[in-house]
Amino acid sequence: MSRIGKKTIVIPAGVTVTLNGSTATVKGPKGELVKEFNPEITINIEGNEINVSRPTDNKNHRALHGTTRAILNNMVVGVSEGYEKKLELIGVGYRAQKQGDKLVLNVGYSHPVEFVAPKGVDIEVPANTQVIVKGYNKEHVGELAANIRAVRPPEPYKGKGIRYEGEHVRRKEGKTGK
């Protein structure tokens, strides 16, 4: 048995999960998520718990078992609590600001870099060197945060760039002059 797949998912109060064939719909206070799963994996809703089971022990079914359970759990947590990723800008003159629904980054290029948040994802700028990406879909929050970080990933010599909060950047020593 998959150790992750055999765990039950507890549905919190205020969240409803409905199954239509192999499509799961999860509604909660933060929003609604719909996802289609592989029809070979069985999803059962009993009271306020979700159980995921697989037909056989072959490698493909074992992989799908844990993945299906993890995605369903992320959907339930997302619509009830939500997800957030914090990014920090480190470097002289690096700053972020919000203009309407756009995030504008000045990170050392000749032009500012702009991002528009997709539906269901919010961008907050509490300080000009800090960005918070919030939303109920873990996939969209992580993707937008990764795209923002990819504009100027942290470099190993001075540590300048955009990094996740708490991310450790491996530092290198520069060349030694003669």
UniProtKB/Swiss-Prot annotation:
Stored InterPro entries: Ribosomal_uL6-like, Ribosomal_uL6-like_a/b-dom_sf, Ribosomal_uL6_a/b-dom, Ribosomal_uL6_bac-type, Ribosomal_uL6_CS
Disordered: annotated segments: 159-178
Ribosomal protein in keyword set: yes
Domain of life of the native organism: Bacteria
Biological-process GO terms, alphabetical: cytoplasmic translation
GO molecular function, one term: structural constituent of ribosome
GO cellular component: cytosolic large ribosomal subunit
The entry's keywords: Ribonucleoprotein, Ribosomal protein, RNA-binding, rRNA-binding
Protein function: This protein binds to the 23S rRNA, and is important in its secondary structure. It is located near the subunit interface in the base of the L7/L12 stalk, and near the tRNA binding site of the peptidyltransferase center.
Similarity comment: Belongs to the universal ribosomal protein uL6 family.
Subunit record text: Part of the 50S ribosomal subunit.
Name assigned to this protein: Large ribosomal subunit protein uL6
Lineage: Bacteria, Bacillati, Bacillota, Bacilli, Bacillales
